[in-house]
Structures are given as structure tokens and as C-alpha cells.
A protein has these predicted regions:
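Juxtacatalytic substrate-recognition/specificity segment
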Residues: 184-315, 319-321, 332, 423-427, ...
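TPR repeat positional signature
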Residues: 38-39, 108-109, 113, 145, ...
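Pro/Ala/Gly-rich low-complexity, hydrophilic intrinsically disordered segments
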Residues: 66-110, 124-187, 438-467
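Acidic/His/Gly-enriched intrinsically disordered linker/tail segments
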Residues: 181, 270-285, 292-296, 315-448
């Protein structure tokens, strides 16, 4: 019986292998569809054979391409056969087939990348990223490794790590900038970064590793800024690394925020920041914090890479296009680690929520022809600086998240010209081949969100801020938000949200701002609203809630502002709320 079982298993795996006979066309969608189909066939075989864990791994393996988000990959380490020695014969057969499917996908991705790099309508940035994606599928893929200029270690013939381990040394003299005493701080050197910190050597190493990863992700995100089609073609042909400046970038990491603020006390509003890049010192300056500081670290490191890659003199963006200087740095704040890959961009990016809220509530911001004309001083002295920064972030996302390679390329090329100080006020229109009126229309359209966006985007559980009001989202899409337990700010104004749809937000107990203007909520949602005890602002305008809401709302002791205009809450109900919650401001 056992022999028959193994024979049947072997036949199942072989039958799955035969379906690989027809090579997919060298098109990314075709490759993905073929890969998905083969993985599902393999997963079904695993189900049949009782290999539950292997079926799960197989089904969850493929990365998902979603609208507006770019996939990024760090070069993996080749580990060989990672199966435990005691793995059963069936599991070993699964592993062989699983690895073979990934090798085929890697081969297809590499061929497509080479084609894209040299085609008449070349897309070198996508080609560069696909070479990295190929290594995710097959870390030992020689064609992709060679195309990226990777080298083998002379000692054991293994592929060299993309970033050697950082080295640590104690400060042997007083630090020339911070005044840290000899032996009271550490220097950490990695391939691209030189870090000094008074926290610990381990903290410096941890930061160095994050910044080395970021360096690799930054290159994939802004390929047109630092390289070109010709250099990529030549690199693929000659199997050599693409040219980069051989420099280390300086970073200071302070033990506490207070030390950071004291060191930068001459900078305006420095107490409001979580990181700073100093042009004058050519140094990024950070303090030790939790995971919420990482987007700022990436933001400031991006400024540093843009500024120092070619030794650009100070004064970038002084005459025009300052929006892109800040917009590109804010774009990388959307980087997310998904384990075997990263993403950047997408409708859910934190920096897109406020501009979406403003635009869909009638404040369209500046026409792009006016935005591109603003220089650094004009922006930083403007009374509307926050709105301009917000629009700058959204406009950068509009370019870098665009479905058209021409628009994505235009973003990187515009950055290159800005930092070469060759840009003009007309550069954006020229590079995209669109009029400013067409760009305005495209920008506004890019801020919309649909049910499909919500239902196909992974990682929603991480969201902290979300503006969906007056988008095309319905109850169908809202069902995807049951995982959003980290939300602090949620805006649903004008959506067809009834009591049943609102129940999807039962896990959002950390909310401090909630906007429900114009929704279809009734008093039935009161028990749920009463659980949001951290709320400081609540908008119930133009809903069907009545004075029955008063007892439940009175439990929200942290509430500072309540909007009830157009609701069924009467003047008497308002007075009861004011009596229950001291200092509550009610907009009616």
C-alpha cells in the first residue's frame, strides 16, 4: 500500500510538471498568470496528499502586483537546500517541484528584463527591478546575478552579500561635532554609511543595516535619477555593476530626543521633527525611537542620497520645482516590508490621506502649473506651507504610482534634472508629454479609491490614517477593513455606510478622530461608537442619529469636538452632552 501511495504521489507531481511544457510569452502579465496557475496546481496536489503546510506555502508564495504600488526586492542570500534532514519523501518531492517552478519564473523575469532594457520603447527602471525580483524566485539565478554585476566570493564561491557586515569601533577622540567624550560613543561603518552614536554599538549596527537596505530600495525606486538605459544595457552586456559614487554618507544617532533637539536648536521648529538632513553638514541626524520614526529616517536619507550622489551644490529647488524635492522624499515614507519583498507607493500611503480628503471635499489645491513655479523660499515662507507639502507628496505619488512607464520615468528624470539644476518650469509637462490641464485632471483622478483597491491591497492592518470620504467605495470594499486595528484617523464622509457596513470597524478601538458626515448611520451604531473611548473628534453631521445617542456619546470622556449639524440630535441633547463632558465643543 505504501509503495502504491508513493507511486501515485510521484505521478501527481509529474503530471503537474508536464503542464510546464508550453513556455509563457515574454510578457509580465502572462508570466504571472502562468506562475499563479502552476502554483495552484501544485497546491492542489499538496491538498490531495495531505501536505497542508506545503499547500499553504505554495498558495501564499507569489507576490501580488496591485495598482499604484511598486514591488521592490533586496538581493537574497543563497542558502542551499533549506529542508530539514528529516523531511519526508513527499515533502522533498514538493520542494523540488516548488523550486523548479520558481526557477522557471526567474528565468522568464530575467529574459523580460533584458528585453525591456534594450527595447525601442525601453523601460530600464522596470527592467532593473525585474532582475531583483528574479533573484527572489531563484537566489542562484546566474543570468540575473551577472546582469546586476554580482560577484562570487573567492573563498567559497558563494555570491557576495550586497552589503558586508558593518564594523564597530569606540570613539578614540572627542567627537568633533557633538562633543561626545572619548570612549562614550561608537562609530559604525557599513558599505555606504558612516554612523556615530552615543546609544550603543548595537544601535548603530541596526541603523546601518536599515540604511543599507534603504539604499538598495532607493535605487530601485528612483532608477532614472542615478542611472540610465545605456548604463543598464552596458552592465547587462559586460556583467558589471552599474556605476555608483564610492562615498560613505554621514549619520548622527542621538540617544534621546532631547539631545537631538538641543544639538539642532538653531533650526526652526526642530522640536516637531523626528529627523533632519543638514545640507551644511552633509549629515542625517536622528534619535533613537520606536518604529514610527523609520519613515522619517527614510525621508531624510533620501534627501541625503539625492543631494550627495553627484555632489550637488546647495540651492536645489530655489527657483522652481521645490515640490518634487520634498515630494520624492515623502514618497519613500510609504515603503513597507512584506517579508520577502517591499512595496512603495499606493492609494493607502499615509501621505495621500489628507490631500485626498481636501480634494474630494472641494479644495483642489494649486493648479500644477503654479505648483511647479514655486521655489524653496516661496514654499517655506507661505502661510499655506502644510497644504503645499501635502499636495507635493500627492503629486509625487501621482507620477511614481502611475500605470504608465512614461509618467514614472518622468518623475525620476525630473529629479535628476532638478539636482543637476537643469530643470525648468515646463519640465514636468515636457517629460510626461501632457499639458498642465491634462496633468491636473490626472492628478485629481489619481486620488480616487474603489472597492477593488481595498479588496486587492495587502497590508491594510498597518494603516493608521485613512480617508475614503466621497470616493467610489461601497460596503463591499469596506469589508476589507475589518483588520484595521491600528487606525487613528478615519474619514468616511458621504459614503453609503449603514449600520451593517459600519460594523466592519469594530476593531478600530484606537481611533481618536472619526468623520461620518452624510453617512446612513442610525442609533443602532451607538453601542459600537461608544467603544471608541479614545475619540477626541467625532463628526455625526447629516446622519440619522437622535437624542438616543446622548447616553452612549456621554461615555466618550476624551471627546473635545463633536459635529452634529443636520443630525437628529436636538438642542436639548446638545445641552445634556455639554453637561456630561466638560469643555466639549459642539458644532451645530
Amino acid at each position: 500500500v505504501k509503495l502504491l501511495f508513493y507511486f501515485a504521489a510521484a505521478m501527481l507531481f509529474l503530471s503537474a510538471a508536464r503542464l510546464w511544457a508550453a513556455d509563457p510569452s515574454e510578457d509580465l502579465n502572462s508570466l504571472d498568470r502562468h506562475f499563479a496557475r502552476e502554483l495552484e496546481i501544485l497546491a492542489i496536489r499538496c491538498d490531495t496528499l495531505g501536505l497542508t503546510e506545503q499547500a499553504k506555502i505554495t498558495r501564499e508564495w507569489q507576490t501580488r502586483r496591485t495598482k499604484g504600488r511598486t514591488l521592490l526586492f533586496l538581493p537574497p542570500v543563497v542558502r542551499g537546500n533549506d529542508l530539514p534532514k528529516e523531511a519526508s519523501d513527499l515533502v522533498q518531492k514538493w520542494h523540488v517541484k516548488f523550486h523548479a517552478l520558481r526557477q522557471e519564473q526567474a528565468s522568464g523575469l530575467t529574459k523580460l528584463a533584458v528585453s525591456l532594457a534594450s527595447a525601442k520603447e525601453a523601460d530600464p527602471a522596470t527592467a532593473y527591478r525585474l532582475l531583483h525580483e528574479a533573484l527572489r524566485e531563484d537566489p542562484d539565478n546566474r543570468a540575473a546575478r551577472n546582469a546586476l554585476g554580482h560577484r562570487r566570493n573567492a573563498t567559497d564561491n558563494a555570491w557576495e552579500a550586497y552589503s558586508p557586515p558593518p564594523t564597530i569601533s569606540a570613539g578614540k577622540t572627542p567627537h568633533p561635532k557633538t562633543g561626545w567624550q572619548q570612549g562614550k560613543y561608537w562609530r559604525v561603518d557599513s558599505k555606504h554609511w558612516r554612523i556615530a552614536t552615543n546609544q550603543s554599538g548595537a544601535a548603530g549596527v541596526e541603523l546601518a543595516k536599515k540604511l543599507e537596505d534603504f539604499h538598495w530600495l532607493w535605487k530601485q525606486t528612483f532608477f532614472e535619477f542615478w542611472s540610465s538605459r545605456a548604463e543598464l544595457e552596458q552592465g547587462i552586456t559586460n556583467q558589471r555593476p552599474l556605476p555608483e559614487p564610492g562615498i560613505q554618507l554621514n549619520v548622527l544617532l542621538f540617544r534621546t530626543r532631547d539631545e537631538y533637539v538641543k544639538y539642532l536648536s538653531s533650526q526652526p521648529n526642530i522640536g516637531l521633527t523626528q529627523g533632519f538632513y543638514s545640507d551644511a553638514q552633509q549629515t542625517s541626524i536622528f534619535f533613537v525611537g520606536d518604529e514610527t520614526v523609520q519613515p522619517t529616517w527614510f525621508h531624510e536619507a533620501a534627501h541625503q542620497l539625492f543631494q550627495q550622489w553627484r555632489g550637488t551644490p546647495q540651492g536645489v529647488g530655489e527657483k522652481q520645482n521645490f515640490w518634487m524635492v520634498e515630494g520624492a522624499a515623502m514618497h519613500v515614507e510609504s515603503l513597507q516590508n512584506h517579508g520577502s519583498h517591499w512595496t512603495v507607493g499606493g492609494w493607502q500611503a499615509d501621505r495621500l490621506q489628507i490631500p485626498r480628503y481636501r480634494v474630494l471635499n472641494g479644495d483642489k489645491g494649486l493648479p500644477l502649473q503654479q505648483l511647479v513655479a514655486l521655489g524653496r523660499d516661496q514654499v517655506q515662507s507661505s502661510a499655506d506651507i502644510r497644504k503645499i507639502y501635502s499636495q507635493s507628496a500627492a503629486t509625487a505619488h501621482f507620477l511614481f504610482d502611475h500605470e504608465s512607464p512614461m509618467y514614472r520615468s518622468a518623475g525620476g528624470t525630473l529629479l535628476r534634472e532638478i539636482y543637476r539644476q537643469n530643470d525648468q518650469r515646463t519640465s514636468l509637462a515636457q517629460l510626461t508629454g501632457a499639458s498642465f490641464e491634462e496633468l491636473d485632471a490626472g492628478y485629481l483622478k489619481s486620488l480616487q479609491v474603489t472597492d477593488d483597491d481595498l479588496l486587492t491591497t495587502p497590508g491594510l492592518a498597518r494603516l493608521r490614517n485613512l480617508a475614503l470620504g466621497r470616493t467610489q467605495v461601497t460596503a463591499k470594499g469596506l469589508a476589507a477593513l475589518t483588520v484595521c486595528s491600528e487606525l487613528r484617523w478615519l474619514e468616511l464622509s458621504g459614503l453609503p455606510v449603514d449600520d451593517a457596513a459600519f460594523a466592519n470597524f469594530k476593531n478600530c478601538t484606537k481611533l481618536d478622530q472619526l468623520f461620518l458626515d452624510g453617512t446612513q448611520l442610525t442609533d443602532k451604531s451607538l453601542p459600537l461608537i461608544a467603544t471608541f473611548t479614545n475619540l477626541e473628534e467625532l463628526d455625526l453631521s447629516n446622519t440619522k442619529l437622535t437624542d438616543e445617542a446622548v447616553p452612549a456619546l456621554s461615555k466618550l470622556r476624551k471627546l473635545k469636538t463633536l459635529h452634529v449639524t443636520g443630525s437628529g440630535i436636538t438642542a436639548a441633547g446638545v445641552q445634556k452632552l455639554k453637561a456630561a463632558i466638560l469643555k466639549l465643543e459642539i458644532q451645530n
